[in-house]
Amino acid sequence: FVTGRVREKRENEKFGALYYVDMVNGETLDKVLQRPNFEELTPIFPNERLHLETDGHSTAMRIVDIVSPIGKGQRGMIVSPPKAGKTTLLKETAKAVLKNNPEMEMIILLIDERPEEVTDIKEAIQGDNVEVIYSTFDELPEHHKRVSEMVIERAKRLVEHGKDVIILLDSITRLARAYNMTVPPSGRTLSGGLDPAALHMPKRFFGAARNMREGGSLTVLATALVNTGSKMDDVVYEEFKGTGNMELVLDRKLSEKRIFPAIDITQSGTRREDLLLSADELGASYIIRKEMNGMRKEDAVEQILNLFARTKSNEEFIEKVGKIRTNYNR
């Protein structure tokens, strides 16, 4: 964002010309000239945690905090079938980050979304450092593409200034679909009619997430659609699988049984979670996964949700899990 002085527009001009630049992205020109290049910064594993637990007692956020923790610079994916609660989860995550880390620059990017969903998110998540950028489903694919490229470039410039930025993208599947309709045909086609060249820019967007050794971080949490009945959506997910370092999987069967949050705990997780969790939290996470092994998924998740409901905080939950394990060993 460029701030400066504008002269009066003339009769034949649509806009007044900018004749003096004061600031770029909220920084003075001296600092802007000294900023490093994003590609030259050193990426490292996320080592500073984003706590999602709040006083509102959101069970979903408490589960994510232990099962699949998020750090500054995380490249995370929320894998979800339709109607499993991905948008609600993304909204809760945004509220938690806004409350616990108000210094972070937050950009919520909604691609190919319903207009009423956009209004809901704009009204629910408001703050000085929050931007809701959107391109609804009635816009052209070229507009989706242009909006997403502007967002990622703005985020990179903020990281170059040493700021911590988080992008919440809904969804990377629809972004890939938009690129599939706009890229020149490469002559090759994956199953589902997806051109391999269409995945290059969405991968660049997702791959930009990183924690910088020199300071600053870019966190990207993107939703990916699966089991929609479209082969292309499954191919997009398979292409992105393994590129992230955190995955949160939602289960359709759990949501159909009205078990919310419908998080598949066994399939969800974070790489190098030991850098983010304390020893007690790590132990509780291992115990939960071990105890779930061999149980029916629905029963296991329901038991864990009941345990979360009976405790007021994650600290109390970890203590309770430790006691259960001690009694079990006896």
What are these regions (language model features)?
Residues 1-3:
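Short nucleic-acid-contacting surface segments enriched for D/E, G, S/T with interspersed K/R
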Residues 7-78, 84:
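P-loop NTP-binding catalytic core
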Residues 55-62, 89, 147, 200-201:
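Short secondary-structure boundary/capping elements
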Residues 78-79, 91:
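Active-site scaffold segments
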Residues 84-85, 93-330:
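P-loop NTPase catalytic core
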